[in-house]
């Protein structure tokens, strides 16, 4: 992933935004024909390459042709590795040319607030029609009453585990280690048996912050105070979390995880190398899709030997870091009106449902409408993902998930704090380093 240094980030955040025009979609749908302005319009939509490939196929094979038929808009869908999205945004904003709509993750919208269009009219319309947005979506994408992006979906990670291997060490019939101490003890037994845990400490967008931020919070650690300005990382709770992480890493984990990206643990689990990893549901869905390809050591389908659980509890509580997905309308776009009509249309219930159903529970909708969807009744192994928007905490805690918090997560400061410690830096020094890096950002 191309890194964004502080100078580039500040320059990017100061770029000008272009106000967006508004336009209703109801008339288009009622008339059954595309509006005149859109006959020759092309909207370029940049997204991540989905960890549920079937969903990208729905977009390409169904949504693209339906978009042109309904709106007269040619949809240019481009998918790339999520780790490359931020570099792409930087180059597009600096050149004033690029995709009209870019889907981003987490609280990244706060980095680009000055370079994106106001989409309040679109977001309010969608939210009102679909039961209102989750607090997480509103907190990230609504700034002082203005929507800087249209929330698309909310994903996140749970522990993906091998049922039979946990059974062998005494965790059967739905039981699972509840605390970090219990999870570490289980992990030591499993690693000694050749089945380590797998967790990344690399610079990768999802699995790294998705594990280490909730881990920090569960010990009572936090980046800043509630004022969003006073850096509070250098605390006993944080130091204790780092000390425990060093032992946890050595006792339980595949130490190659220092260099893993978001796909590495998928491959490790599917190949039978690891027994537990924090991940979205993509491992399970891939194993279920190819039951003859992914087998246990006994030759049985791997997907039947998988279950999902939340991360363990600590002295500070039990948390998750939901992954917010947001569509940004870029300020440089010369297709503001067409892009807004596209956003209204693709986020509307009948269109979005096609994509949402193909996810099979990998993500929740950003609005509360989707927690009642029948997809959650299909497979009980997927059901725990439904509740992630309600149990999550956002980066920047105990302050807001603002631009500074987005810079910290983009620079992987919290992840690197733990990575430095497991590679030999004393816990106190690792925390001091991270504290000083946060001060640079928040000052």
What is the predicted role of each segment?
Residues 143-152, 157, 181-231, 237, ...:
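Extracytoplasmic/periplasmic solute-binding protein
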Residues 39-41, 70, 145, 165-172, ...:
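Extracytoplasmic/periplasmic substrate-recognition and gating elements
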């Amino acid at each position: 992933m191309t890194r964004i240094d502080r100078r580039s980030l500040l320059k990017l955040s100061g770029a000008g935004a272009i106000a967006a025009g508004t336009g209703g979609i109801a008339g288009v749908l009622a008339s059954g024909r595309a509006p005149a302005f859109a006959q020759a319009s092309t909207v370029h939509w940049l997204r991540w390459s989905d960890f549920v490939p079937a969903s990208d196929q729905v977009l390409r094979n169904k949504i693209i042709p339906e978009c042109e038929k309904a709106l007269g808009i040619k949809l240019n869908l481009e998918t790339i590795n999520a780790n490359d999205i931020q570099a792409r945004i930087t180059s597009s904003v600096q050149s004033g040319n690029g995709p009209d709509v870019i889907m981003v993750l987490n609280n990244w919208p706060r980095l680009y607030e000055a370079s994106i269009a106001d989409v309040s009219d679109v977001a309010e319309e969608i939210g009102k029609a679909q039961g209102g947005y989750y607090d997480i979506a509103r907190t990230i994408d609504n700034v002082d009453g203005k929507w800087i992006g249209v929330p698309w979906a909310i994903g996140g990670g749970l522990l993906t585990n091998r049922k039979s291997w946990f059974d062998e060490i005494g965790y059967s019939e739905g039981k699972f280690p509840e605390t970090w101490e219990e999870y570490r003890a289980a992990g030591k037994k499993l690693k000694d048996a050749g089945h380590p845990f797998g967790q990344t400490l690399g610079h990768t967008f999802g699995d790294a912050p998705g594990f280490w931020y909730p881990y920090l919070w569960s010990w009572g650690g936090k980046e800043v105070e509630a004022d969003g300005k006073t850096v509070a990382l250098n605390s006993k709770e944080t130091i204790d979390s780092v000390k425990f992480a060093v032992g946890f890493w050595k006792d339980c984990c595949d130490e190659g995880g220092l260099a893993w990206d978001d796909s590495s643990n998928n491959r490790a689990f599917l190949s039978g190398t690891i027994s537990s990893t924090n991940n979205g549901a993509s491992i399970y869905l891939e194993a279920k899709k190819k039951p003859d390809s992914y087998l246990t050591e006994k030759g049985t389908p791997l997907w039947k030997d998988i279950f999902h659980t939340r991360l363990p509890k600590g002295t500070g509580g039990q948390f998750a870091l939901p992954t917010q997905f947001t569509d940004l309308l870029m300020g440089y776009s010369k297709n503001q009106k067409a892009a807004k009509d596209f956003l209204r249309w693709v986020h509307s219930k009948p269109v979005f449902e096609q994509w949402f159903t193909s996810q099979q529970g990998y993500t929740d909708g950003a609005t509360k409408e989707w927690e009642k969807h029948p997809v959650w009744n299909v497979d009980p192994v997927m059901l725990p993902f439904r509740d992630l928007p309600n149990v999550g905490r956002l980066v920047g805690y105990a302050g807001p998930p603002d631009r500074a918090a987005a810079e910290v997560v983009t620079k992987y400061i919290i992840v690197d704090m733990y990575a430095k410690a497991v590679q030999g830096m004393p816990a106190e020094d690792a925390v001091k380093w991270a504290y000083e890096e946060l001060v640079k950002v928040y000052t």
